[in-house]
Amino acid sequence: KPGDLPAQELTGGRGVPARGSWAIRARVPAPLPAITDLGRMTVTLHVCITCRAGEPANDAMLPKGGQLHQSLDALERPPDVRIVPVECLSACNNGAAVALSGPGRWSYVYGRMTPADAPEILAGAAAYAATADGIVPWRERIAIFRKRSLARIPPIG
């Protein structure tokens, strides 16, 4: 459609076959530059849409990660946060998982997220976007980010 972002179809991968009606509708945006049109640096909130969060496979039902993505996408997002669905964050035992990253910043992977956590996740992403290095002071981090952190990855470069 005019004005839509370029996208690529999910075809399965990383051992996760694209099955069920949810897989046909899921589209992953093509990579975008990390700088907004105003010159501010944006951060990316990656959401694993294939996370089943310990539930058995059900081809007719959207996985918990996909439900989380829908919940996040339905909310107003912070201006410097881009939400990108991904097929797998390799946190299957701790799904649904999200990851925060940005140029020159520490990156984080968080697990055990639910659709009900969406407002807090976006608040945490906004706090992350407001930092120069990706490190939100411990006491200022939202509780779910303090308690559900799976990994902290140093900046690349």
List the predicted regions and their residue ranges.
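Local cysteine-cluster metal-coordination motifs and their immediate loop/turn environment
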Residues: L45-A57, P85-S101
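Short flanking/linker segments adjacent to small metal-binding domains or redox-active Cys/His motifs
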Residues: N94, A99-R105, A125-G157
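Glycine- and acidic-residue-enriched helix-capping/strand-helix junction motifs
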Residues: P56-G65
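Polybasic, low-complexity association/targeting segments
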Residues: P29-G54
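Extreme N-terminal basic, low-complexity initiation segments
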Residues: K1-L10
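Ferredoxin-type iron-sulfur electron-transfer modules in oxidoreductases and energy-metabolism complexes
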Residues: K64-V81, M113-T114, P119, A123
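Immediate flanking context of iron-sulfur cluster ligation sites
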Residues: L38-H46, H69-A91
